[in-house]
């Protein structure tokens, strides 16, 4: 690192990981990074711990270690989204993904708290803006985007795109520079 320093540190954050001294701890299927189930945290339907405060902790920890500006390049919630009819939505359909809005709101509030801790956060990008096929599972059942793509894992579907409720929510967060976040 001495000869090839970096200008900033970028990282992805989806969940925290807990450890235990118990020789036979409960391990959840969502703990892809190892670790054990944290009974204090909610988990997504994929078993990933939902830990917004863990993001603030990670930001503080990385700053303390490297003293480089930080860039969150991936953060989001994968879920099985249900497309529903909604006459008020463009194209007459949407996904009411309050769970994604809550996840992102709570994580962005913690980014704001880290900034108040004087952590230099360069930026934040969500994962992802549009539903896509998973590189690890080659399926689209688990969706992250603000835009729903009518595509199934077997390849069927019209490929029509629909804005989810989170699309307009995130658009408003950007337009208000975070003032619309619920604290």
Question: Where are the language model's segments positioned?
Answer:
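Non-catalytic scaffold segments within catalytic domains of secreted glycoside hydrolases
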Residues: 1-183
């Amino acid at each position: 690192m001495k000869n090839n320093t970096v200008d900033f540190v970028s990282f992805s954050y989806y969940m925290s990981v807990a450890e235990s001294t118990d020789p036979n701890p409960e391990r959840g299927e969502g703990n892809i990074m190892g670790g054990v189930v944290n009974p204090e945290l909610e988990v997504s339907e994929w078993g990933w711990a939902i830990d917004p405060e863990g993001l603030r902790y990670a930001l503080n920890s990385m700053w303390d270690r490297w003293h480089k500006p930080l860039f969150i390049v991936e953060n989001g919630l994968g879920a099985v989204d249900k497309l529903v009819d909604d006459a008020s939505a463009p194209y007459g359909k949407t996904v009411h993904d309050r769970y994604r809005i809550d996840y992102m709101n709570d994580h962005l509030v913690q980014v704001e708290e880290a900034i108040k801790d004087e952590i230099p956060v360069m930026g934040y990008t969500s994962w992802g803006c549009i539903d896509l096929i998973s590189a690890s599972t080659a399926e689209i059942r688990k969706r992250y985007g603000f835009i729903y793509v009518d595509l199934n894992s077997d390849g069927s579907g019209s490929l029509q795109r629909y804005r989810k409720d989170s699309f307009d929510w995130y658009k408003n967060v950007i337009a208000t520079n975070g003032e619309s976040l619920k604290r």
